[in-house]
From Swiss-Prot:
Enzyme Commission code(s) on record: 3.6.4.13
Name by which UniProt lists this protein: ATP-dependent RNA helicase DED1
Top EC class for this record: hydrolase
Domain Helicase C-terminal: 399-559
Organism: Scheffersomyces stipitis (strain ATCC 58785 / CBS 6054 / NBRC 10063 / NRRL Y-11545) (Yeast)
Region feature (Disordered): 1-122, 566-647
Single GO term (MF): RNA binding
Subcellular location: Cytoplasm
Entries under PROSITE patterns matching the protein: DEAD_ATP_HELICASE (PS00039), HELICASE_ATP_BIND_1 (PS51192), HELICASE_CTER (PS51194), Q_MOTIF (PS51195)
């Protein structure tokens, strides 16, 4: 069987023509070579540009190559092709098309069945396993890093009645045997702290609200337990549907909502791995792609639906999805969904459609931060839940080496070239504040001999997916991005994150640099700072101190000046949030005794009962949050998050 890396490399760059003129020019930048080598990846926005010289990667023949990145599982409309879990023909049989989907006269490879109250996994399929899990030598299928064992020392705080003891390994029981096999094929060797607690919490029928640092395994934290319980207990019976589209309506058992197209696609990819050979058929829907194709994919069967709120609302209104059988509701990156203005859609989906009541389903909320308004959402959506805080919520990982450089705006490009020239050949993400700057910087780097591509909200879905695929494969190892790629994306082996433009909000800085140092790996985060960024000085100093990083003298000096002038800040003030250690708002001053901190390998301390009043919502937050919010407000800064930058 050919190594999947070789297959991807063969597909990654299609030659734009013949002859040496379409090959990388020898000595032209880091990717120089002779005329027999393949052409370099060309970003989508540059493919139709005509150049008069052989600069960049055009070689002696001049002009940029027009090869396009291939090997993606997206069709020409930019939609995910559900090839593994697809099918044809119409049926209500769960073992084939399933749950309002299409029929096949024989079982599809990689898809199991639920028959007569029993789970019947399908036979193993070598081709599918290579596609889903890759090979052990392929670093793009990385599951853990050299510092993974350090997660055992991360403190874990769990509050609520009857907190179960954490698991210490992936075993059956408590997990289903098939899921353990899929986890093993994914080369996960041990659970992260959030996974150690989420598995027994969900197995015990409890709701969960989890805060964990970025890169801590939140996706597995909800996929592992809900899939395991689904394999053990099976689907809910399908009620008879009525209406014009009743025969085409799907009835998923699991619903996962997340804010962006990239994040739901990533969750879907992970779900395919862990649902392999099971009766659970994953599907994904999101805006910006052909809804007709997504409906056709749904009709092939859908038991686990991953969706953005806007597209899901559309499908519900069209009568193509029923939520009546939902057993598990997952809200991932809940704070970002509210930042993007999705709260009305989320409340409509959860409270006004046919989803079972909070008492008749299990609900899990995951995110890196949980300000007050998110905790209020939890009060409405969750019942008798356990609040889980892993590590210092809202802080950065010590696996990331942070470097703050003082660079004036006009010197940024020169310093960036020095950094890229001196660094090792690893994947690098460069963040800018505007879409125009992202395109400008990608063009500049390309002209200087660095294969770069850009991703932001103005790119079509097809272009975005092609650019991400090129970046992950190394065909274009430099990705210039706006905030569209800053949250949730789990791209293995990102060695360096560069904040070319610092964000106005320190939380956004945290999530940007969290693209490196994931799953216990080490990474470097470099930020270009000057006096135009004074609004985040206080937050930067606190983050560096918390993560045991060096605070540059110039930053400390500007921090003292800003503090004296009363204009520090950079925190998101409009939402009443806090970046201090998040605590369960139910543990107010008027009720509930608090226990101690546990660690990820032991049981949690014994927490008292949650207060019955629950009125003192802010009492659990650190006092410094108030000074952050007031400073932010007095500086005259509004909410820096723009929905348009994400879409």
């Amino acid at each position: 069987m050919t190594d999947i890396t070789q297959k991807m490399n063969e597909l990654s760059v299609q030659d734009g023509g013949s002859g040496a003129g379409n090959s990388p020019g020898a000595g032209n930048g880091p990717s120089g070579g002779n005329g027999s080598r393949r052409s370099q990846y060309v970003p989508p926005h540059l493919r139709n540009r005509n150049t008069s010289s052989g600069s960049g990667f055009g070689g002696n023949g001049g002009g940029r190559g027009r090869g396009s990145f291939g090997g993606s599982n997206y069709n020409n409309a930019g939609n995910r092709d559900n090839t593994i879990f697809g099918g044809s023909g119409r049926s209500r049989d769960r073992g084939f098309g399933g749950r309002g989907g299409f029929r096949s006269n024989q079982s599809r490879p990689g898809v199991g069945r639920w028959v007569d109250g029993k789970h019947e996994p399908s036979a193993r399929n070598e081709r599918i396993e290579l596609e889903l899990f890759g090979t052990a030598e392929d670093t793009s299928f990385q599951s853990s890093g050299i510092n993974f064992d350090n997660y055992d020392d991360i403190p874990v705080e769990a509050s609520g009645d009857g907190v179960p003891d954490p698991i210490t390994s992936f075993t059956a029981p408590p997990l289903d045997e098939l899921l353990v096999e899929n986890i093993t094929m994914s080369r996960f060797t041990k659970p992260t702290p959030v996974q150690k607690y989420s598995v027994p919490i969900v197995a015990g029928g409890r709701d969960l609200m989890a805060c964990a640092q970025t890169g801590s395994g939140k996706t597995g934290g909800f996929l592992f337990p809900v899939l395991s319980e689904s394999y053990i207990n099976g689907p809910a019976p399908i009620a008879e549907s009525t209406g014009a589209f009743s025969s085409h309506k799907v009835h998923p058992t699991i619903l996962v909502m997340a804010p962006t197209r990239e994040l739901v696609s990533q969750i879907y990819d992970e779900a395919k791995k862990f649902a392999y050979r099971s009766w659970v058929k994953p599907a994904v829907v999101y805006g910006g792609a052909d809804i007709g194709q997504q409906i056709r994919n749904l009709d092939k069967g859908c038991d686990l639906l991953v969706a953005t709120p806007g597209r899901l609302k559309d499908l519900l209104e069209r009568g193509r999805v029923s939520l009546a059988n939902i057993k598990y509701l997952v809200l991932d990156e809940a704070d970002r969904m509210l930042d993007m203005g999705f709260e009305p859609q989320i409340r409509h989906i959860v409270q006004e459609c046919d989803m079972p009541d909070v008492q008749d389903r299990q609900t899990l909320m995951f995110s890196a931060t949980f300000p007050t308004d998110i905790q209020m959402l939890a009060r409405d959506f969750l019942k008798d839940y356990i609040f889980l805080s892993v590590g210092r919520v809202g802080s950065t990982s010590e696996n990331i080496t942070q470097k703050i450089l003082y660079v004036e705006d006009e010197e940024k490009k020169s310093v960036l070239l020095d950094l890229l020239s001196a660094g090792d050949a690893g994947l690098t993400i460069i963040f800018t504040e505007t879409k125009r700057m992202a395109d400008n910087l990608a063009d500049f780097l390309y002209d200087q001999g660095f294969p770069a591509t850009a991703i932001h909200g103005d790119r079509s879905q097809y272009e975005r997916e092609k650019a991400l695929a090129a970046f992950k494969s190394g065909a274009a190892p430099i990705l210039v991005a706006t905030a569209v790629a800053a949250r949730g994306l789990d791209i293995p082996n990102v060695a360096h994150v560069i904040n070319y433009d610092l964000p106005s909000d320190i939380d956004d800085y945290v999530h940007r640099i969290g693209r490196t140092g994931r799953a216990g790996n080490v990474g470097i985060a470099t930020a270009f700072f000057n006096r135009n960024n004074k609004n985040v000085v206080k937050g930067l100093i606190d983050l560096l101190s918390e993560a045991n990083q060096e605070v540059p003298d110039f930053l400390a000096k500007i921090g003292r000046e800003s503090a004296f002038g009363g204009k520090t800040g950079g925190m998101r003030g409009g939402r009443g949030g806090s970046r201090g250690p998040v605590r369960d708002f139910r543990r107010g001053a008027s009720g509930g005794s608090s226990g101690g901190w546990g660690n990820s390998s032991g049981s949690a301390g014994g927490w008292g009962a949650a207060p019955s009043g629950g009125n003192s919502y802010n009492s659990g937050y650190s006092s410094r949050s108030n000074s952050y919010n007031s400073s932010y407000g007095s500086s005259g800064y509004g909410n820096p998050t723009s929905t348009n930058s994400w879409w």
